[in-house]
Amino acid sequence: MNTIHYNDIVQLPPCVATIGFFDGVHRGHQFLIHHLVETARKEGLQSTVITFDAHPRKVLQADYQPEMLSTLDSKLLLLSKTEVDNAVVLHFDKAMAAMSAREFMQQVLHDHLNVRKLFIGYDHRFGHNREETFEDYVRYGREMGIEVIRNEAFQIDGINISSSVIRSFLKEGEVEMAAQCLGFPYTLIGKVVNGFHEGRKLGFPTANLDISHFGQLIPAPGVYAVRVRLENTVVWKRGMMNVGNRPTFNGRQLTLETHIFNFDGDIYDQLLLVSFVKRIRGEQKFDSPEELAAQLKEDEQTVLVLFEKKAE
């Protein structure tokens, strides 16, 4: 897959394209991209996914804090695992936000990206204030020589899969359902930072994550079975993560603490990927650190048994 930043484009060869933010590159997105690639091959054209370098709402509302399923880098990596030829990254700014759908289709899709067919997700809208409808896109496309095609929704158990649906599952701690919709486990990336060192005192040293730079959604508070790896390695290690405010220690700040099994290395300031497997329990307040330590031992056994069953 060729990754092309919009400012670097002279002009693309004629292509079949789709446009969207593609947060998470979930199974609904994969379903659309599969149809896109199939059509492009039949037509003898290149296939192109057009996305943005920033969440549109973040550009329009400076104080908006997005809850992303993927970073731009992880999104591009996921797109590269499809069979699409090109990923075009548009720089979304206020000037682009002010463009009508007709202007965007003419100036960006037609004149610059050489789009001949445009696949639109079943619920996708674009253009200033998202004011226009699919029928408008079809009419504009007809004028410009772009065939506009609406892709059907991808469903699981009668539910239309979308990034919003996946976020809802994660906020409930339903990481297994989120993984079913994504097609892979939900994964956070963060920098390992100094914590409160309470886990080490309890016999469970943890890697504490700061994910503020990446803007990803944090699943519901609780204890999770996870797999982790450092960004520059390929080996996934088993572990368990606590998401919460440390109520036993009267904490108020949300923390992400990961105990990596059979590991006690120094990984401060490194980037760690955490892949969520299953929520073991909700967050609890214990009467003493000793009671918490006993529960952590139970949690560890629960997680180890879970991984053994998955390995069978």
Give names to the regions the model predicted.
Residues 2-8, 88:
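Short acidic-hydrophobic, aromatic-tinged amphipathic segments that line or gate anion-handling sites
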